[in-house]
Each structure stands twice: as structure tokens, then as C-alpha cells.
């Protein structure tokens, strides 16, 4: 019965709370879109959130019953595709891989141009040029380049605060 489950959920809400919600994507289980691996940072973030004792802070500052929407929501995604919805959480941490031009000769196959979801790669002479303003650091162009003309440049994370929708919040 839906109503009974809803009552149990609402009655147990305060005992289920930790002061934060930490989610991550399925990237570590083999997602082909991974720009970086978040396996090592998720436990570290969880430890920091537990150490901060956000639940005690919420109990002191929130008048009335605590609800899940009071908790700090943090999500980690291994790529800008953001299947774990970091854009709509209080803190979103997105994996990023910026391409870098190497000394390897370009064969002009245009695989990098075709795979870029933002049309940030253009083929010029002598090879690909990445528009840094349009690039979302997904690393797809790096992954498909058969000659490694586009190699892995800077990798890391982009942090978004405040929760907004869209690929370009």
C-alpha cells in the first residue's frame, strides 16, 4: 500500500538523516563516458562530510522537524554527461579531461570533430583546434583520436555550487 509506505517514510525521516546526501554515478563500474575516475575521492568526501557533523548543525539551526530537503546534497559524476544529476544538487563535482595537442601527426580522419557533442573541435592545418570556451572537457575527442594527436591534457574536476539545470548551468 502506497499510503502506508509514505507514512513509514515520513515517520522515520528524522532517524534516517545524516545531515548530507552523497551520490555518485556508475562510472567506476565501467561507463565508457568516464573522463576521470572518482573511486578515490568519494570515500574522502564522505569522511569529510561525516567529520563536519552536519546533522548536529541542522538540529541546532532548523526549527521544527528535520526533513530530507534540509540536508546538504553532494553528487560526484565521472563526466559532464552528469547522469547522477550534479547540476541540481547543492554541490556538483564533475570529472573533466581537457584535450591537448601533441606532436603526433594528424591524419585528418575527423573522428574528433564528429564525436564532439559541443562542436568545439575544428580541423585546420595542420590538425585539430579545440575551442576552449565551448569544450565541456568530456575527453571524447581524446578517446577517439587514432594517432593521439589529441592527447590528455589537464584532468580533474569542475565544481558547481547552487544547483541549476542544463549542461551549461
Task: List the predicted regions and their residue ranges.
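Short, intrinsically disordered, charge-balanced linker/junction segments flanking boundaries
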Residues: 156-169
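Iron-sulfur cluster-binding cysteine motifs and their immediate structural context
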Residues: 90, 111-128, 140-158
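Small-residue-enriched alpha-helical segments and adjacent helix-cap loops
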Residues: 1-107, 115, 129-136, 165
